[in-house]
Amino acid sequence: MNVKILLLLVGLNLVMHSNATGDSETNPAETLFIEEIFRRGCFKEGKWCPKSAPCCAPLKCKGPSIKQQKCVRE
C-alpha cells in the first residue's frame, strides 16, 4: 500500500515538473504583472471608490466630482 502511494507521488512529481519546465503557450499580454495583483480590500476597475478604501494597483480614483469617482486605469 505504501509503495503504491510512493509511486503515485513520484509520478505526479514528474508530471508537474515536466509541465513547469516545458514550453508554455501563455501570451505575455494576458499575464498579470506584480503591481496588478489585487490586494485584499481594494476596489477593482469600474467600481465606485469612496475615501475609506483604495483602488487596486495600478488603478487610480478619478471622476468629475468627489461623489462620482470610479477606479480607472491611467
UniProtKB/Swiss-Prot annotation:
Indicate the residues removed as propeptide on maturation: 21-40
- What do the Gene Ontology cellular component annotations say? extracellular region
UniProt KW keywords: Disulfide bond, Ion channel impairing toxin, Knottin, Neurotoxin, Secreted, Signal, Toxin
Disulfide pairs here are: 42-56, 49-61, 55-71
Q: Which GO terms describe its molecular function?
A: ion channel regulator activity; toxin activity
One of its Pfam families is: Toxin_7
Q: What does the entry state regarding organ or tissue expression? A: Expressed by the venom gland.
Query: Which interval of the chain is the signal sequence?
Result: 1-20
Subcellular location(s) of the protein: Secreted
Q: What is known of its domains?
A: The presence of a 'disulfide through disulfide knot' structurally defines this protein as a knottin.
Protein family (similarity comment): Belongs to the neurotoxin 35 family.
- Give a short account of what the protein does: Putative ion channel inhibitor.
Protein name (Swiss-Prot/TrEMBL): U12-theraphotoxin-Hs1a
- Source species, please? Cyriopagopus schmidti (Chinese bird spider)
Taxonomic classification: Eukaryota, Metazoa, Ecdysozoa, Arthropoda, Chelicerata
